[in-house]
């Protein structure tokens, strides 16, 4: 299926669907399952240098929500609401394990990457060095984990300042010579184009956007929060928000910065939508948590069917919409159009 082939900069991918970091890929078995399902690559469950971030996993909890915000386990689930923590495994041991899996994956044109959820610059540099020594090819630096505001102090840090981000990425870049360095940004900032450009100046090979949002869901039966706390919230509803920032970032970088879309992909059509806005690949996780690893196979198959029907290659989509995006001032005037979207009483004569 060469029409699915893509790349993130100079790094080739057999298709644009990557399994994102999370609980499904916290074991070697889970990573292999994602690869068997056809994923172009897997971002293995994240680490950092803070024991508190790993301990947080013992307090993790999860809920799938329907469109009305009600907890559900059925097909109506459209959003994942959860709090989480990092893998409870020695960093060197974990990186050795996933490096072996990466070597296996490379024989099939796929990859397995290391990931860190940022806590400190020194820690990120040290962890990145361990990933390089383990022989891994891709390192994801996640500076946008939504849980930062709720986690124990210092366990997780969210970076939203462009100057600090540039300095951080430059340090990590120095520790990852010869590796792909992908920086994952927060969804809790309107400054994503500036943050993306800062990451690029620091030496990032690609930028992923965007992390989930923090939310609070009241349970109308108990009058208490679902899961007992605020938690990270993402779903298909987020896709238009992600698409807008992908397009704005592609424009800010004049197409020079490879982009990875994440948060909201539930179908092959969603992959195509993010591609049109500039994403050369996407990361999926919530769909896997809800539907199993078969969700990866389904999404890839749906995308391939779409491309075949349209007579296109995936690369034809990347940035096509973003490069032609217009603003409000570019639109034709349509006086009275508002009348089509109000109740009839609004238009009655007094």
Provide a role label for each language-model segment.
Residues 2-7, 28-106:
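Glycine-rich, positively charged N-terminal anion/phosphate-binding segment
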Residues 44-50, 140-147, 206-216, 264-265, ...:
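Glycine-rich phosphate-binding active-site loops on the catalytic face of alpha/beta enzymes
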Residues 234-256, 268-350:
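Alpha/beta catalytic cores of nucleotide-metabolism and tRNA/nucleoside-modifying enzymes
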């Amino acid at each position: 299926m060469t029409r699915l082939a893509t790349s993130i900069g100079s790094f080739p991918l057999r298709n644009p669907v990557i399994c994102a970091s999370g609980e499904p890929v916290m074991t070697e078995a889970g990573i292999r399952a994602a690869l068997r399902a056809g994923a172009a690559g897997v971002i293995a469950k994240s680490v950092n240098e803070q024991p508190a971030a790993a301990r947080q996993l013992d307090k993790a909890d999860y809920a799938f929500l329907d469109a009305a915000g009600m907890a559900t386990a059925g097909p109506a689930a459209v959003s994942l609401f959860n709090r989480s923590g990092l893998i409870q495994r020695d960093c060197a041991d974990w990186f050795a394990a996933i490096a072996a899996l990466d070597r296996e994956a490379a024989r099939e044109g796929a990859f397995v990457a290391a990931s860190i959820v940022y806590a400190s610059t020194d820690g990120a540099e040290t962890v990145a060095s361990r990933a390089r020594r383990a022989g891994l090819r891709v390192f994801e630096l996640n500076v946008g984990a939504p849980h930062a505001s709720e986690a124990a102090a210092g366990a997780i840090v969210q970076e939203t300042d462009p100057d600090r981000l540039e300095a951080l990425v430059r340090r990590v870049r120095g520790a990852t010579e010869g590796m792909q360095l992908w920086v994952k940004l927060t969804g809790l900032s309107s400054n994503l184009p500036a943050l993306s450009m800062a990451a690029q100046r620091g030496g990032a090979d690609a930028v992923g956007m965007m992390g989930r949002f923090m939310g609070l869901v009241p349970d109308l039966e108990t009058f208490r929060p679902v899961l007992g706390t605020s938690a990270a919230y993402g779903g298909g509803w987020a896709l238009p928000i992600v698409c807008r920032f992908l397009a704005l970032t592609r424009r800010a970088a004049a197409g020079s910065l490879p982009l990875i879309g994440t948060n909201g992909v539930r179908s092959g059509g969603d992959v195509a939508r993010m591609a049109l806005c500039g994403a050369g690949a996407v990361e999926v996780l919530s769909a896997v948590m809800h539907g199993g690893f078969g969700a990866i196979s389904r999404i890839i198959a749906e995308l391939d069917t779409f491309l075949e029907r349209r007579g296109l290659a995936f690369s034809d989509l990347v940035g096509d919409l973003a490069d032609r995006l217009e603003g409000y001032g570019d639109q034709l005037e349509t006086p009275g159009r508002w009348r089509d979207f109000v109740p009839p009483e609004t238009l009655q004569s007094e």
